[in-house]
Amino acid sequence: HLADAFGMNVVVSTRTAPKNCPYEVTDILTAAEKADFLTFHCPLTPQTKGMVNRDILSVMKPSAVLINTSRGPVVNEADLAQALNSEKIAAAYLDVLEKEPMSPDTPLKTAKNCTITPHTAWAAYETRSRLVDIVCANIRAWLGGNPQNKVN
């Protein structure tokens, strides 16, 4: 919903269509073609590992920006560096990398218009406050006999 505040047209690509989603839901390649800002918010699974690769990057607009705050291996770093250096996309902002701490060999280290933060996107006060609220709610639920987010 934050993108709405900036007047952005939001397009969603997900394995399972969310109920009552106010946004257009489409496949990942169509989303990549339409995107001015393509952001990733997914877990690392066998299906998502290397998902952002030459195929997706090749259909993006030359003015598009890629943002990854999910998991580093979702992005193929060599393909992204090539897309940035050949100006197939405009920029990338990454809070996660394939290897952390950053490998001295990553091609993203010298890629054009690539900004890398040290896995701290969660560190804003508001985010940490929300995290504490969730933990407290989970403890209250557990004490009340209704545990949440069980891992058995």
What are the residue ranges of the model-derived segments?
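Conserved anion/nucleotide-ligand pocket segment
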Residues: 1-11
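Alpha-helical scaffold segments in soluble metabolic enzymes
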Residues: 2, 37, 79, 134, ...
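Generic low-polarity alpha-helical segments
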Residues: 2-3, 71, 150
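Intrinsic disorder/low-complexity signature
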Residues: 5, 33, 65, 92, ...
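Rossmann-like adenosine-cofactor binding region
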Residues: 9, 15-107
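C-terminal helix-to-coil terminal segments
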Residues: 98-152
